Amino acid sequence: MSAEFITLVVAIGLAFVASFVLFRDGQLKGKSIDRAAAKALVERIIIAESNGDPNAKNKGSSATGAAQFLDDTWLEAVRRHRRDLIQGRSDKGILDLRGDAELTRDIAARLVEEHAAMLTKRGLPVTAGSLYLAHFAGRGGAVALLSGAESADAALVMAAADMTGRTTREKLVNANTFLKAMTVGDIKSWADRKMAAGTRPGRERLR
């Protein structure tokens, strides 16, 4: 085992522990989440999504990078928040930026703040778990899951929330096999566990 590998493992572990402390202490204020808490939560999301690997790729979907951003989500987010990066770049060039760990963290933190405001506006809980659901399932998917019947099929609820009609239960399960038998209640508990204190860093799945 190389010294570089050991250093990476230690760094990931320290980042995870630090993120728990920061997010625990960060306040969720009305329609927003403070920037420190958003950044702290992003560290936990990254551990859950890819174990911190900026080159992670899901073979079943377009999810790429440390935060496992889908193509459409990343393109929209960069165009909205970092227009300075668009000039002179093709869509492929913009998508390749998902390999930039710091940019990924910046974009993810901005989206966490947006998700918190959206959930608050809809009267839904703003917790580490609900914010992770918004990252994982998208805003529409998170709203549907947080508002849905506990016994409903989670993948069906997520697919139905996609207004474009491009998402199907089959596609979701192919990319996330653990969803096959999950109910809405199951996935909410899963998200809470993934973001909870004491969760062991490690790659459970890639979206």
What function would you assign to each model-found segment?
Residues K57-G88, S151-L156:
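Short, surface-exposed glycine/acidic/tryptophan-bearing loops
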Residues N174-R207:
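Low-complexity, Gly/Ser/Thr/Pro-rich intrinsically disordered linker/tail segments
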Residues G129-V184:
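Catalytic and substrate-binding regions of cell-wall glycan-acting enzymes that process beta-1,4-linked
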Residues S2-A56, R98-G123, M195-L206:
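Export/targeting segments at the very N-terminus of extracytoplasmic proteins
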Residues D71, L75-Y132, F136-A144:
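Alpha-helical segment that forms one wall of the substrate-binding/catalytic cleft
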Residues A40, T64, V126-A128:
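Extracytoplasmic
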